[in-house]
């Protein structure tokens, strides 16, 4: 499968951004891992795929895949890159738009000077909301690092 992609970075995170609006995209977990591999693939922290929305109130759906091929709910730096990507690829002329994610719906604001603002909502700290397995909420959590 041949795909057109764009490599982007936002605040130190780097992404492979794929337009699933104008091209058909169906990637397996193995293919996602290969793309993210810094030695054999393109290399990135996450792969971002933008597709048409399945809700008429949203402009696009935004899929986030970690380097291991697993899904992520959303990524703030990735959302800002998606906003810039949508503007530069002329996929939208809107200045305010909603993105559907596997997590919460994100509001993006695209300024005329190229900046992108992502309304990420309030941070969540309750372990079950993140998701994170812990007996209770705590300001710090111990971790057992074996090496």
Regions found by a protein language model. Give the residues of each.
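ATP-dependent small-molecule kinase catalytic core of the GHMP/sugar-kinase superfamily
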Residues: 91, 95-147
């Amino acid at each position: 499968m041949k795909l057109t992609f764009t490599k982007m970075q936002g605040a130190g995170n780097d992404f492979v951004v794929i337009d699933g609006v104008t091209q058909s995209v169906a990637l397996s977990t193995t293919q996602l891992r290969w793309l993210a591999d810094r030695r054999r693939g393109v290399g990135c922290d996450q792969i971002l795929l933008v597709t048409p929305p399945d809700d008429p109130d949203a402009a696009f759906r935004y899929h986030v895949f970690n380097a291991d091929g697993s899904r992520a709910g959303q990524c703030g730096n990735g959302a800002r890159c998606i906003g810039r990507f949508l503007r530069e690829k002329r996929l939208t002329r809107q200045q305010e738009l909603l993105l559907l994610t596997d997590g919460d719906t994100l509001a993006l604001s695209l300024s005329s000077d190229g900046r992108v603002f992502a309304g990420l909502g309030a941070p969540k700290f309750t372990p079950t909301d993140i998701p994170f397995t812990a007996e209770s909420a705590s300001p710090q959590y111990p971790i057992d690092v074996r090496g």
